[in-house]
Every structure is written in C-alpha cells, then in structure tokens.
C-alpha cells in the first residue's frame, strides 16, 4: 500500500445536514452548517467508501390537485392467483378485496374469514358478517398468506392514506348494534356505533383524503328499502363532521370514490330502486353533499335490463331490476364516462369496460367505444371498485375485479373465497385477453 504524507494548512468546508424531528411527525428542513478547520492530513491511497446521511423527506398531506390522465383504455397491472395457490398452500379465505396506495406503493386489502382455505373452518364461509372476520393488508400482488397483517376486526371496511399515515375504517359487531372503529397510524383514534340498528356498513374500497381531511360514505338501514346514508369527514382518525346524504339518490351503498379536486366523487350501488348507479359528490371544504345518477343508458349494475331497454335520466333511479345489485365503479371524463360491469346482465359473470360518449352529461346516452373484456362471460366475477394513483403529471384511474369462487354456484366445495385482478388506465395501445381466477375446482380442498 502506498502512503503519501501531506502536511499543510487547509480550510475545509463541510456541508453537514441536521434532521431534527419535531412533534406530530414533522421534519425540520435540512440546513447547511459550514465548519472551518485547520488540519494536518495523512492520506492513505486505498479504496475508501464515504457515506452521507440523507434527510428524510418531509411528509405532506395529499391534495390530488393534478388533472386526470387522458387514457385510451386499461392495461393489465396485477393478479394475485389466491385460489389457485390455495390448492397447495396456506392462503386466507377472503372476500370484498380492494386496492389503495400510499404515495410510494400500492397495497391490496380484503376481509378475511379467520381461516385458510384448506381448513375445516372454511366450511360455510359464504356468510358476510361473523366476529372472526378481519381486514387483511399486503403489498399489491402478494397473496394473503399466513404472515399477512390483520389490520383490524372488520366485516366491512375502507382504507386510505392521507400522505402521512393510513386510515382504516373497520365495522364489526352485532347486525343491530355494530361498531365502526377509526384507526389512524396504527392507533385507535375514534369510534361510532350504529345509528339505525340495521347493519352499519361502508364502502369496501378506498376512501379519499384531500389536504388532511378524509371522507368515507357509510350506510345503516334496509338493504332493500329506505336507509340512512351519512358522509363522515375525518382528520387523523378523528371524526370532525358528519353530513347526511342529500340530492336525488334514493339508495346508496358500497361507494367507489375518487378524488376530483377540490372535491371527492363516488359511484355507488342502489340496492333498492335502480340498476343505474348513484353519484355522490362530496365538498371537502364546506361538507356539502349532492347526489344524482349516472346518465349513461348503458347501466352499470347487475341485475339489469338488456341494453336496448335499459335507461337513465341522470336524476332518478330507473326502477329497472333495482332490488339487489353488486359493487361497481365509473368515472367521468369530460362529458363522457368510463365504466365497468359484469358481462352477464343477470349474474356476476364476466367483466367488461368501455367508454360511453356523453354518458356523464346526456340522459340515456348509449354510444359505446373502447370496449375491453377483462373476464370472459363463462367465468365468474364479483365486486369491483376504483383506486387512484398520482404520477408526475396526472392522476391515473385504476380498477380491480373480485373473482369469486366456491359456493353458492360451485357446490363441490363448502367454502366461498376470491382472488383479484387489477388494471390501470393507459394512454398507449393494448391487446385482448381474459383474466379469470383460473382455479380448477376439482383440484381444490373441499
């Protein structure tokens, strides 16, 4: 090793950065400190690694103020293959999956049944509400294995990230007196009991936070008649305001919400009167609410009439096969609307997406373009919902489709569970395909 000895007086300028933590998880901006020293150096000519500390990035509330991305359709993004993997591994029994992202990464959520599939406890898991159900959370694309985190106790849920921490809304308890727990940054901050004593429930997809205020739609009351829907405004887990539903929507459940700065917009399920989907507009600043229905005459719920006879006047439920339904989504694109729905008009089979020209602005619009098949009509689908991803220049809309397997339709087995497939908006070109669950029911544990 060569050694060079240098004896001299020099002035060194070191740019050091201090990163002092303050209360409430705030981070002091890094400030340079100039240090001057007179030194004598012995320099060893060898390989040297110099490491510098990088200050943590200042966490900020999300505001979602960028424009919506212009898209031509949707491209495949993720598929977890949970049911296929359950044939030979310990995978949770789940339903009601959804996706939500923090500023750096996307996660998949689902309501577990307190059991894996190859387990006798999986018998009769067709039931929605039991005390053993918990909200599961994994990085998107990671199936719900035994090491999966159970975020909270819940048979109905919603989750969203405000830019600083996760908020989870978790409903559990008796049908006639359930409790909603509000968990922020891993801590229980607030709670609310049932207000109509008839299955308090929430979105089964992501809530939305703008400038630190998160909003979630909750319903308590009849699933096939008049119910009491309220919109909650939450700051760091604390309920700060509750607004009643107003406008012309008659029945609102299982909303799929997205940021439409400075407001939040939701597309929901009318389980009483309409196969056209209700819209709920939420003003974050003044807590005001308005509602109506998607104008497209190609309606989004299941069951529904055939496309020739289906209708929507933008304001009222269409009174066409309104009783029963399925969670779904749509989003506005100028005067047009992008939407997804089952291919079957009668059952949760197949899945398609398309754009309806003037479907957001003109009653009974039926001009369809850019149709894509996500799941072919011979395979089962289920719930679907929206989530938003902020990129450098715009906000992209993505959706997931629940792929239900087992009971009631597949009576060889005693369980009911699901996997998930996810697509995101693209401005590029795309091909064709079908992405069903893919499990051979004869290979599965009974």
UniProtKB/Swiss-Prot annotation:
Please indicate if the UniProt record lists Hydrolase as a keyword: yes
Q: Where is this region: Head of neuraminidase?
A: 68-446
Coiled-coil ranges from the UniProt annotation = none
Which of UniProt's keywords are assigned here?
Calcium, Disulfide bond, Glycoprotein, Glycosidase, Host cell membrane, Host membrane, Hydrolase, Membrane, Metal-binding, Signal-anchor, Transmembrane, Transmembrane helix, Virion
What's the protein name? Answer: Neuraminidase
Report quaternary structure and partners. Homotetramer.
InterPro entries associated with the record: Glyco_hydro_34 (IPR001860), Sialidase_Influenza_A/B (IPR033654), Sialidase_sf (IPR036278)
Per UniProt, where does substrate bind?
95, 129, 253-254, 269, 348
A GO BP entry: viral budding from plasma membrane
Q: Which organism is it from?
A: Influenza A virus (strain A/Swine/Hong Kong/127/1982 H3N2)
Its lineage opens with:
Viruses, Riboviria, Orthornavirae, Negarnaviricota, Polyploviricotina
Q: What membrane topology was assigned to this protein in its record?
A: Single-pass type II membrane protein
Which residues of this chain are annotated as glycosylation sites? Answer: 38, 47, 63, 123, 177, 211, 379
Q: How is it modified post-translationally?
A: N-glycosylated.
Q: What is its EC number?
A: 3.2.1.18
What else is noted?
The influenza A genome consist of 8 RNA segments. Genetic variation of hemagglutinin and/or neuraminidase genes results in the emergence of new influenza strains. The mechanism of variation can be the result of point mutations or the result of genetic reassortment between segments of two different strains.
- Region annotation Hypervariable stalk region: where it falls in the sequence: 13-65
Protein activity control: Inhibited by the neuraminidase inhibitors zanamivir (Relenza) and oseltamivir (Tamiflu). These drugs interfere with the release of progeny virus from infected cells and are effective against all influenza strains. Resistance to neuraminidase inhibitors is quite rare.
Instruction: Name the cofactor(s) required for activity, per the record.
Output: Ca(2+)
Instruction: Give the domain note.
Output: Intact N-terminus is essential for virion morphogenesis. Possesses two apical sorting signals, one in the ectodomain, which is likely to be a glycan, and the other in the transmembrane domain. The transmembrane domain also plays a role in lipid raft association.
| CDD domains from the UniProt entry | Influenza_NA
The enzyme class is hydrolase
């Amino acid at each position: 090793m060569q050694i060079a000895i240098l004896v001299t007086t020099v002035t060194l300028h070191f740019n050091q950065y201090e990163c002092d933590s303050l209360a409430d998880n705030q981070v002091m901006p890094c400030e340079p400190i100039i240090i001057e020293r007179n030194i004598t150096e012995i320099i060893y000519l060898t390989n040297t690694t110099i490491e510098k500390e990088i200050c943590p990035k200042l966490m900020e509330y999300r505001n979602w103020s960028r424009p919506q991305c212009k898209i031509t359709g949707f491209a495949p993004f993720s598929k977890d293959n949970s049911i296929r993997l359950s044939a030979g591994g310990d995978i949770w029994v789940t339903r009601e999956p959804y996706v939500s992202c923090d500023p750096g990464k996307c996660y998949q959520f689902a309501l577990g049944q307190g059991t894996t599939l190859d387990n006798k406890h999986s018998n009769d898991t067709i039931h929605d509400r039991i005390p053993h159900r918990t909200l599961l959370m994994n990085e998107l694309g990671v199936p719900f294995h035994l090491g999966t985190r159970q975020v909270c106790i819940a048979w109905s849920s919603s989750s969203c990230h405000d830019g600083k921490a996760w908020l989870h809304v978790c409903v559990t308890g008796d049908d006639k007196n359930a409790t909603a727990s509000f968990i922020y940054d891993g801590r229980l901050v607030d709670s609310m009991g049932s207000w109509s004593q008839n299955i308090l429930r929430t979105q089964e997809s992501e809530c939305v936070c703008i400038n630190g205020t998160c909003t979630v739609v909750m319903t308590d009351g009849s699933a096939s008649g008049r119910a009491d829907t309220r919109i909650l405004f939450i700051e760091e887990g604390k309920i700060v305001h509750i607004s009643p539903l107003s406008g012309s929507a008659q029945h609102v459940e299982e909303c799929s919400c997205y940021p439409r700065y400075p407001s939040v917009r939701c597309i929901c399920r009318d389980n009483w009167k309409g196969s056209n989907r209700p819209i709920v507009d939420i003003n974050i600043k003044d807590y005001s609410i308005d509602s109506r229905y998607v104008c497209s005459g190609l309606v989004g719920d299941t069951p529904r009439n055939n496309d020739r006879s289906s209708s929507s006047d933008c304001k009222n439920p269409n009174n066409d096969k309104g009783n029963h339904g399925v969670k779904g989504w749509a989003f506005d694109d100028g005067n047009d609307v992008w939407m997804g729905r089952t291919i079957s008009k009668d059952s949760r089979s197949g899945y398609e997406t398309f754009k309806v020209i003037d479907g957001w602005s003109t009653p009974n619009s039926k001009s369809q373009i850019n149709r894509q098949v996500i799941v072919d009509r011979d395979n089962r689908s289920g719930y679907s919902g929206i989530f938003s991803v902020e990129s450098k220049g715009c906000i992209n809309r993505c959706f997931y489709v629940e792929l239900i397997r087992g009971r009631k339709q597949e009576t060889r087995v005693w369980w009911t569970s699901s996997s998930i497939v996810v697509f995101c908006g693209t401005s590029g070109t795309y091909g064709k395909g079908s992405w069903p669950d893919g499990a051979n029911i004869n290979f599965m544990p009974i």
